[in-house]
Amino acid sequence: MATLAMSTPSSPTWPKRRPKAWAMRCERYCCAAASYFPLAFVYSLTTWAVYVEASVGLKPSSSSWIGLPSSILGVVLYLALNISYTTAVFTDPGSPLGARSGGGHPYSALPITELPEYTSYTVNSTGGSRFCKKCQCPKPDRAHHCSTCKRCVLKMDHHCPWLATCVGLRNYKAFLLFLIYTSLFCWVDFGVSAIWIWTEVFNDTRYMDGILPVNVVLLSILGGIIGLVLTGFTAWHISLATRGLTTIECLEKTRYVSPLRKALDRHRYDGLLGTNTGGENQDTFGSRLQNYGNQILDAHANAIPGVTRPEEGEESSDNLTPAQQALSRSYADLERQREHDRYEDYLAELDNEKMPHAFDLGWKRNLLHLFGDRPLHWLVPTPTTTGNGWEWEPSRKFLEAQERVRQQREQVAEQQRQHQRDLYLRNMNNSRAWLGNELPPGWTPDQPLSHSDDVARPATGVSMKTLAPRSPRPRPGEEVYAEDLDKDDFVLEPTRGKGSGNQSSREDDWRDWD
């Protein structure tokens, strides 16, 4: 039996199919080559354009607008746009991940530096702190995750396919300069080629046999079309830069943090029944002891993140799970709380739509943030943008609007609490009206009721005897009944021996009547 037990067949193990190394390497090379195709296209197209434009300017022409100055201007714009393009492509836009340790160590994905402290003015769709689950890092304001680059980008504007990278905090200045220089270069090429075609081709046919007229016509067509489209795109980005906006912030709705959500939660649990009234004495021993305890908690809040306070980058959850809430609260209370939360979210959405842009500091300060403090570096595509991408200064209009919304919401909440307090007091007065007295003047709903002064229940003037049914015939023992017996003595005289039986029968009749 032992032999049979030891000889039980085991399940066959199939060999794992591993992808071939050469196939993965080939796929990686193909993706890298495809990502460099936009770069090769831009470099080749601009090189051909400057060659045709310079050739037209260097040839003798009857127009005073075409000559050596036009060729020099075209070459300068060509160099400026290509330098800006190269800088925008190969400059890291910035990421909240920072420098991570490489290698195949199991802990290589952990950060080696502490993330900087920052104040966030934007939240996610649920109202919590913004956290990237793919990068496993908190997202500061204006940072977004790019699915193409597979990482979060600081002050992300958009992912440009012609740059094969994201446009963010560090390379947005070079990208904007590239748009400006390219638009000017396209209009210069269009102007030079159009003037040359008008003055040379239509009036003289000596250039019709060469290849130059074909290139000039193509240059004028491409320069006009690309210049028209790119100029509008450039003007739009300049307007975004002056307003302190990004493409994502302009096209998508930004959800800002509610200015009074924590205050509403505090007032909801502390002052719903009048415990936080203005006339309460705050100098009592209990109040001072509670303040000392709150100070100790605040001092040790950062000691154990995630326990004494919500950890940064994580959404704070309720203290009780839905199952625990269902056990401790009734369905009506839970439904009432859900309705209240939905109404609060609706009000937050309305307030969020009325809020101005939080980071619009004025067109001067916005451009200084983008191009830097040194005027000599404004036209050079060097990364002179100020800020680290984590801390953003809010605008004065945003803070004023936030304070105004906070005051309005707190006023409405105070009116609701006062209405609930008045309704509660009215119900208590109605419930104690049968006692013949009212509630004490200084009594509040949070104080216990005193039953020492309860009075006895007043008489109503109605007894159970009054409500009991009465027989139309007199009962035994009543005066009317005795008079009837005296009158009927002559009738009962012959049957005196049976009187006891008759009396018992009469009592039985009365018992049956009752």
From Swiss-Prot:
Modifications the protein undergoes after translation, according to the UniProt entry: Autopalmitoylated.
Localization terms from the record: Vacuole membrane
Q: Name one GO cellular component term.
A: vacuolar membrane
- Spans of biased composition, class Basic and acidic residues? 505-514
Acyltransferase among keywords: yes
Specify the DHHC domain's residue ranges: 130-180
Record bears the keyword Nucleotide-binding: no
Keywords for this entry?
Answer: Acyltransferase, Lipoprotein, Membrane, Palmitate, Transferase, Transmembrane, Transmembrane helix, Vacuole
Q: Which InterPro entries match?
A: Palmitoyltrfase_DHHC, PFA4/ZDH16/20/ERF2-like
The family assignment reads: Belongs to the DHHC palmitoyltransferase family. PFA3 subfamily.
| Protein name, as recorded | Palmitoyltransferase pfa3
Protein source organism: Emericella nidulans (strain FGSC A4 / ATCC 38163 / CBS 112.46 / NRRL 194 / M139) (Aspergillus nidulans)
Q: Species lineage, top-down? A: Eukaryota, Fungi, Dikarya, Ascomycota, Pezizomycotina
Query: What gene codes for this chain?
Result: pfa3
